[in-house]
Regions:
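A generic structural signal for short hydrophobic patches within well-formed alpha-helices
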Residues: 14, 43-46, 120
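PIN-domain endoribonuclease scaffold, especially VapC-family toxins
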Residues: 2-9, 25-111, 127, 133-134
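Short gly/ser/thr-rich secondary-structure transition/capping motifs
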Residues: 18-21
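Positions that flank functional sites
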Residues: 102, 119-120
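C-terminal structural segments of small proteins and small subunits
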Residues: 107, 117-119
Length: 134
């Protein structure tokens, strides 16, 4: 069941959308594009993939995704530091980019949409949905 609110699409969800994964497209239609956002961190990760591939098609896809969704360009540095410290105290680790995305979701009260639920579930108070399961 979908939680109603504003959704922050993680990088893997954007990639699934570009690959036209039916469950992601269905959920996006259900909640509406206007209720979905992305982080500039996600855009950076997508551009990294495009640079790595050297494919003009991939650059065009990133441009299309970044123009489709409103993005958050603010990096919540203090929240990132708090998340990182809490995880380190527990002996847990996730990638820096994921912590920046999580910090945005927590500060803006957004629901993260990701297939990477193992990492994100380590962060207390984070609302998570996986649109790739259904």
């Amino acid at each position: 069941m979908l939680t109603r609110g504003i959704y922050l699409l993680d990088t893997d969800t954007c990639i699934a959308l570009l690959k036209k994964k039916p469950s992601v497209i269905r959920h996006l239609r259900d909640v509406g594009v206007h209720n979905c956002k992305i982080s500039d961190v996600t855009i950076a990760e997508l551009y990294f993939g495009a640079v790595k591939s050297g494919s003009e098609k991939h650059f065009n896809e990133v441009n299309r995704i970044s123009s489709l969704f409103e993005s958050y360009s603010i990096l919540y540095l203090l929240k990132y530091a708090e998340i990182r410290w809490e995880l380190e105290k527990k002996g847990l680790k996730i990638g820096d980019m994921d912590m920046f995305i999580a910090a945005t979701a927590l500060e803006e009260d957004l629901i993260i949409v990701t297939g990477n639920t193992d990492h994100f579930s380590r962060i207390e108070g984070l609302k998570i949905e996986n649109w790739m399961e259904r």
